């Protein structure tokens, strides 16, 4: 409701403890001190395929990453924020409420590597029509 009232393109969901979980249709990541962080499954998220791909990409690119509790303060003080989803792929977040975020080097690196990662890790499927 708050996101609709603010004409936001996406809403960030909190669990009953006030921790960041995910967005309405995407997983969420923050970058803090160069480390990529995303909420763990036990806070109440759907473990998306693209989310898992980003965690694997971080390993391949030697980017530190972890699944960790993220609270609102962590989110609003992050250097970078991005969301992931099958259709969205990797999308940088530019603004939350009145706080602006830049598309940082880490997010940009992941966006640029994503097509190569998908090509390398996908299985071709052919359907005879």
PLM features: residue spans?
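Conserved catalytic-core subdomain
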Residues: 20, 25-129
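Short, conserved active-site entrance elements at the starts or edges of catalytic domains
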Residues: 1-21, 57, 63-64
């Amino acid at each position: 409701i708050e996101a609709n009232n603010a004409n936001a393109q996406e809403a960030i969901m909190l669990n009953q403890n006030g921790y960041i979980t995910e967005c309405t249709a995407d997983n969420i990541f923050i970058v803090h001190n160069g480390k990529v962080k995303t909420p763990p499954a036990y806070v109440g998220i759907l473990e998306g395929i693209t989310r898992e791909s980003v965690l694997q990409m971080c390993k391949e690119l030697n980017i530190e990453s972890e699944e960790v509790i993220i609270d609102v303060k962590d989110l609003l003080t992050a250097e970078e924020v991005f969301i992931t989803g099958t259709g969205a792929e990797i999308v940088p977040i530019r603004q939350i409420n009145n706080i602006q975020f830049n598309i940082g080097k880490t997010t940009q690196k992941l966006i640029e590597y994503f097509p190569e990662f998908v090509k390398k890790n996908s299985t071709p499927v052919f359907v005879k029509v």
